[in-house]
Structures are given as C-alpha cells and as structure tokens.
Amino acid sequence: MEENKINIFYESLEKSLSVEKSELLFNHIMAGDFSDIKLSAILSTIRSRGETVDEIIGATKAMRKHSKKIISDENIN
C-alpha cells in the first residue's frame, strides 16, 4: 500500500490522471494518508495545470465512497 501511495503521489505531479488513478489518489487523500505538504503539492499541481474531466470524476467517486449517508424521515424539497 505504501509503495502504491508513493507512486500515485509522484504520478499526480507529473501528468494528468485517469479516472481510476484519480480515484485512487483521492481515496488516499480522504483517508488522510498524505502530509499537509504533500497534499498541498498535489492539489496545487492539479489546479495549476487545470483539472481534467477524468480527474474530477475520479475525485467525485472517491468522495462519494468516503461520505456519510444521512437518513431522514423529513421530506426535503
């Protein structure tokens, strides 16, 4: 797992990521696996080169997996 995390970290700094690689990266981010400095480097790099559709989809999938489901009896419009 550690090697996988390191590989995806460096890959995210070098080039745009596929949906699968982006989801893997954001799973690590959501799990708190990166230091603040590494997280800053990742997000700054992705932002400076411009997020791709694949990166956004992968990030969304990861965030949905890590989100908490809320059940309510109220009807919310």
Placement of each model-derived feature along the sequence:
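Acidic, glycine/proline-rich low-complexity segments that act as flexible tails and inter-domain linkers
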Residues: M1-N77
